[in-house]
From Swiss-Prot:
To M.jannaschii MJ0857 N-terminal region. This is Uncharacterized protein MJ0752. It comes from the Archaea.
Length: 76
């Protein structure tokens, strides 16, 4: 029996690479704050970091990225 693997080659564009890097920084920021403040819930973390997050990343990124970063951070 032969195994078939489907794949395509693609390249990241610089704006996508920047977005991925920035989102990683957002998640790390959320994790650091959650550890520092002893927060484990998404809602408490979002409420605790929202204003500081906006100072760092808004208006370059919409605030939905804050919510997503908090979701990822609290799921780890």
């Amino acid at each position: 029996m032969m195994e078939v693997i489907k794949a395509i080659e693609f390249k990241y564009y610089s704006d996508v690479v920047e977005l991925i890097y920035d989102f990683k920084e957002m998640v790390n920021f959320c994790i650091d704050k959650a550890m520092e403040l002893g927060i484990t819930s998404y809602a408490k973390l979002r409420k605790a970091i929202y204003n500081e997050w906006k100072e760092k990343w808004y208006p370059k990124y919409h605030t939905h990225y804050c919510h997503s970063a908090c979701r990822v951070a609290t799921s780890i």
